A protein has these predicted regions:
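N-terminal binding-site loop/beta-alpha segment at the start of enzyme catalytic domains
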Residues: 2-87, 147
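Residues at alpha-helix caps and immediate loop-helix transition turns in enzyme cores, especially N-
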Residues: 70-73, 101-104, 134-138
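Short, acidic/polar
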Residues: 37-51, 100-116, 164-168
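Active-site groove signature of glycoside hydrolases
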Residues: 113-134
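Beta/alpha (TIM)-barrel catalytic core signal, keyed to glycine-rich beta->alpha loops juxtaposed to Asp/Glu
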Residues: 5-8, 129-180
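Structural preference for beta-strand elements that scaffold enzyme active sites
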Residues: 10, 18-22, 57-58, 86-92, ...
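Active-site mouth loops of central-metabolism enzymes
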Residues: 29-42, 93-106, 127-132
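Active-site beta-loop-alpha junctions enriched in small/polar residues
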Residues: 26-28, 62-64, 92-96, 126-129, ...
Length: 180
């Protein structure tokens, strides 16, 4: 089968097994909510189903992609075509009111989980560095999500190396979950 050609690896320092290729879902969602070039649910479903057939198990979206409709499409399509434990779902947070404050993170994870139709994320990624929120507040809020089982692993994107280092160091100093 075509799926036998897919290679898998562990996600960072976790035991989460991911396909070496990930399907980015920024192009899935209701047109006009973010971009006019996004794919409708039917076309998104064709791509996701073909990816599953090829052995992809790793899907990445964000709370802001097409005003959340990317997460909605992905959740409905995956639920229709595979068991939750067969896929690794990543989503991102930042482009929202209060960015990476404790309040915003708590609010946005619940909205993301509802849109995806799941009770946990495999990987929660901060989309940017938040200059307005103390690192301690962000890292503690993310740690709480892992502690209560809403998130299995943490990630970060689009920041300077020293910012990533400072966030990792802060997590380790306080005994909180670091980025994977």
């Amino acid at each position: 089968s075509e799926a036998s050609f897919m290679e898998y690896t562990k996600l960072g320092n976790t035991d989460i097994e991911v396909s070496k290729l990930c399907i980015g879902c920024m192009s899935f969602g209701e047109a006009g909510t973010m971009h006019d070039w996004t794919l409708n649910e039917q076309d998104s479903e064709k791509i996701i189903c073909h990816a599953l057939e090829l052995g992809y198990n790793f899907f990445d979206t964000a709370n802001c992609y097409s005003a959340g409709t990317s997460e909605e499409y992905l959740g409905r399509i995956l639920k229709k075509h595979t068991a939750r434990e067969n896929v690794v779902i990543a989503s991102k947070v930042y482009f929202n009111e209060d960015r990476l404050s404790k309040k915003a993170i708590a609010r946005e994870i619940d909205k993301t989980l509802a849109r995806l139709g799941t009770d946990y994320l495999d990987l929660y990624i901060i989309h940017r560095f938040d200059y307005d929120t103390p690192i301690e507040e962000t890292m503690e809020a993310l740690h709480e999500l892992v502690k209560v089982g809403k998130v299995r692993a943490l990630g970060a994107s689009a920041m300077y190396g020293y910012q990533f280092y400072n966030m990792q160091s802060t997590a380790r100093e306080h005994g909180w979950t670091p980025f994977s």
